[in-house]
């Protein structure tokens, strides 16, 4: 399996910059003051550079919501019990979750991926079964996952990206479901970005002050216990991550290898993206960070990564909800690029120089 991961990493190339001048020339020729559509122009340019399609069609969209349970939930770091994870998966499978509503709204197909839920599901439409294990181990007392388990989860995510590419999807989105998963995500940020735990630990599902202080202590203990395992991004992911986070890492790596842009959801999904970027820095060329989460610390993470989220709506749900909303902006940007008239073709006078 290690060889498969090495092959995957080697397949990822930076976005082809040779089209940049032609893209910019077309954007500047559109019937508007140059640069006046701001981020929409940047989004169109990034999408075209990533895919290499100078005349991009509107992409077929797919969101994968990865689900997993966490041993660290036993430490009491969440306001909700762990059994909520499978309950929410069932809610998604029945079409009643926020991500169901928003994915339908934006015309994205939704797949719910069981990569580590502490429950066995019967086969169902839109459910992808690739369980590595029924929940991670408690990272406060040892590694959350073994190296083999981490590899399995990464490669499962990558395989889903490959399947999406083969099925003609041109824009992918990440989502997640896992009670207590802000705890491993925060630990990953603290170690991989050298950020202080206390400054980036948030309330997750709505914990009170006492539980927040306890959560900070649990994360600090987990980092100390696993210090020797955190020499590499992969080792850090195994020690402090979770199955759904590892699968998101693999999903992003697989998409980048196939030159498919990915819209990254919020606080949890960004931790999977961070690991992917630490493994192959050029992965960032294929990523749209959908929104600035209301979860404490996400702003510091975005700043440390040098990226600008597309939206700021005080979202803190996860599931892929922010990714779904941001997909509409990608569509809008490509429509602007494809459908606006040009000065050279519409007989509109350009700016007077001087």
UniProtKB/Swiss-Prot annotation:
Pathway the protein contributes to: Nucleoside biosynthesis; alpha-ribazole biosynthesis; alpha-ribazole from 5,6-dimethylbenzimidazole: step 1/2
Active site: 319
EC number(s) recorded for this UniProt protein: 2.4.2.21
Organism superkingdom: Bacteria
Record Gene3D superfamilies: 1.10.1610.10, 3.40.50.10210
Gene Ontology BP term (one): cobalamin biosynthetic process
Record family assignment: Belongs to the CobT family.
UniProt-listed PANTHER family: NICOTINATE-NUCLEOTIDE--DIMETHYLBENZIMIDAZOLE PHOSPHORIBOSYLTRANSFERASE
Protein name: Nicotinate-nucleotide--dimethylbenzimidazole phosphoribosyltransferase
Natural source organism: Chlorobium chlorochromatii (strain CaD3)
Gene it is expressed from: cobT
